[in-house]
Amino acid sequence: LFCSDDPDLIFPWWSFSKTVLATAALRLVGKGKLELDQRLPDRQFTLRQLLQHQAGAPNYSKLAAYTRAVEERADPWDVEDMLDQCHAAQPEYMPGSGWAYSNTGYLIVRCLIERAANDDLGSALQFLVFDPLEIDSVFLAKTRQDMARAVWGNENGYHPGWVYHGLLLGTAGDAVRFLNGLMTRDILSATLHEQMISPHHIGGPVSGRPWQKTAYGLGLMCGEMNSVGRSIGHSGGGPENVCAVYHFPDVQEPVTVAAFCSGSDEGVAENEVVELVV
């Protein structure tokens, strides 16, 4: 766990970025610029299925070649090359009939947001999500130099382009402010908010992690953790550090907590947020 009194320290948000993308996509649904349950043109799946990891999109981060390339500090592949390597045109299962976590699916979500907003991702997220919540520390990492602004630096030369859906960096406080705002303010309509947190149940306890029930909403991990009940947010990780940002609505005084830790075990950050609450 990284402990500091400096509120301006920058951390990689890793897959917590997915929650921001999902929020932006649902804001566009609310504005009538995207459809949640209509099949996408020339695709077999819907936006809802992408957000809930039920579209069958093959996950590029499972590729051995991807792992080697990241370890070798290589530049990211071109998007088309990545899609070819993971056979993205061939769904792993019929959309809606299964569940499998997919970073590739969220690249498609990114493309949908940029097209519907007629803007680049960073600008779209600022306008759709961060401005309404008065959040100003968050930015989209595009270069190795951007990664070096984070508290741990970037000695391993990691390129954020490997997170094809977009890797956000920001303060721990703004991670909490974003998720707390999403959970307690009206940034989404009541109907869309309810759909976002509605869980697709996945399984039971996970060894080394605090989960008792695992589930996924629309861009949200939303199962139950030891001692705190419902746990709504997202964990994430990359080379050498991990994060967990969660809202706990069932504790006596509902609270939102974030933990950013060195290492590669997301369970460490998840256990830390539980400890901070109980």
Describe each PLM feature range.
Residues 23, 54-57, 89-90, 128, ...:
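Alpha-helix boundary/capping residues
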Residues 5-101:
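Active-site-proximal loop and beta-strand segments within enzyme catalytic domains
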Residues 1, 67-94, 119-141, 146-152:
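Short, charged, amphipathic alpha-helices and their helix-cap/turn boundaries
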Residues 1-4, 8-12, 119, 156-278:
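Catalytic loop of the DD-peptidase/beta-lactamase superfamily, centered on the K-T-G motif
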Residues 55-62, 132-142, 201-208:
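Secretory-pathway/luminal and periplasmic proteins that interact with or process carbohydrate-rich
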Residues 27-44, 116-144, 189-194:
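Short, well-structured active-site flanking segments
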